[in-house]
Amino acid sequence: MQNRTGLILCALSLLTGFLMICLGGFFISNSIFHSQRNLVVAYVLLPMGFVILLSGIFWGTYRQANENKEMFNHVLRQHLAFQDLPLATVDRPDFYPPAYEESLDVEKQACPAGRELLGFPPPLYTETNLEFEHLEDPQPEAPPPYQEIIADAGAPAKAQDAEEPSRVLKAGTALQLTELTGR
């Protein structure tokens, strides 16, 4: 019976708080009741309604927690009594990497250097690409001198100029002005 009475009182406090908030909002927004006395009543109803509503919410929450507290305590005590909490441990010496001095020992290395075991050094590479150099050709072919490249590139242009003069030279200065101005 006490459980039912507490539930009814909790619901009544929630409803009363909500109604007081609604009445305060109605008195403030309604233009018919714009007297000084109605505004005072409205501004008293609003905070009082919020206080009653919040106290009803907290009261209901406290009642529920208090009713179920004994059940939760019983289950928790029963669970803790039957077993100890498992503790996870870590084997520390295996967890950490080896010391610096141990890592320097060649005998203890798990993966020794492969090329050193075979007895020959890694292959030589060229500067331009990563292909293997041929052992019988230790020096790559030297590039031609700069003057030779210029002479080879200039020869076809001179032959073309000798066969036919350019358009600018044929037309003279008039063509140059039209090309510059775009007219």
UniProtKB/Swiss-Prot annotation:
The chain crosses the membrane at residues 8-28, 39-59. It is found in: Membrane. Keywords: Membrane, Transmembrane, Transmembrane helix. It comes from the Eukaryota. InterPro entries: TMEM252. It is a multi-pass membrane protein. GO terms for cellular component: membrane. The keyword Coiled coil does not apply. Pfam families: TMEM252 (PF15664). The keyword Transmembrane applies. This is Transmembrane protein 252. It comes from Mus musculus. The gene is Tmem252.
